[in-house]
Design a protein with these regions (language model features):
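RNA-binding basic/glycine-rich loop and surface signature characteristic of RAMP-family CRISPR effectors
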Residues: 1-106, 110, 114-200
Length: 200
């Protein structure tokens, strides 16, 4: 969620919404950024993460680099994710696709309370995920997809957005399918990539 202002009685941290439908959405940048960070942690040989232009080669290959001496475009393009199953949720008696959770932190020294309201999407919400993979080296496709699979599995164990240590932002990724959008790729390679992503 975001917290640009906090009026009396208002939600302190509202969810991000699609300005066209006013429904919750997940920015592609949030998904991409978290997946990149988790993969960098996984592949780094040091205890501390470095700045993103120093990421391991496989991560730079997939997510790009802005290093002025070695600019690399991202092979992965992430679209924003929009709510898919609002009608399905309403059919089981759910009136709103978001809920507001009231939380309260208390200062240990002063005992002063700090109540706040955090909006979140309800459990069972489904969002559409579209990722474009740009082929640069055909021999690297399967290796790249193994890293993509690993990043998605890491995301399922982690979270997207804020307050993850309190259970927010848990996701499950399923129904992944690889298709050729432009150009010709060997069908055996496509089948192999689909097999890899079935492990998510």
């Amino acid at each position: 969620g975001s917290s640009q202002f906090s009026a009396i009685g208002a939600v302190d941290s509202p969810v991000i919404r699609d300005s066209y439908t006013d429904k919750p959405m997940i920015p592609g940048s949030s998904f991409k950024g978290k997946m990149r960070t988790l993969l960098a942690k996984q592949y780094f040989r040091t205890a501390m993460l470095q700045e993103h232009n120093a990421d391991p080669e496989i991560v730079l290959r997939l997510f790009g680099s802005s290093n002025k001496n070695a600019i690399r475009p991202s092979r992965l393009l992430f679209s924003d994710m929009f709510l898919l199953n609002e009608q399905e949720l309403k059919a089981v008696g759910i009136d709103s696709v978001t809920e507001v959770k009231f939380e309260n932190s208390i200062n240990r020294l002063t005992a002063i309370a700090n109540p706040r309201q955090i909006e979140r999407t309800i459990r069972g919400s489904k969002f559409g995920l579209d990722i474009i993979y740009n082929v640069e080296e055909e021999k690297e496709i399967e290796e790249d997809f193994k890293a993509i699979k690993e990043g998605m599995l890491l995301l399922e164990y982690d979270y997207i957005g804020g307050h993850g240590s309190r259970g927010y932002g848990k996701i499950k990724i399923n129904g992944l399918k690889v298709e050729t959008a432009i150009g010709d790729i060997d069908s055996k390679v496509i089948d192999s990539c689909n097999k890899i992503l079935k492990e998510v």
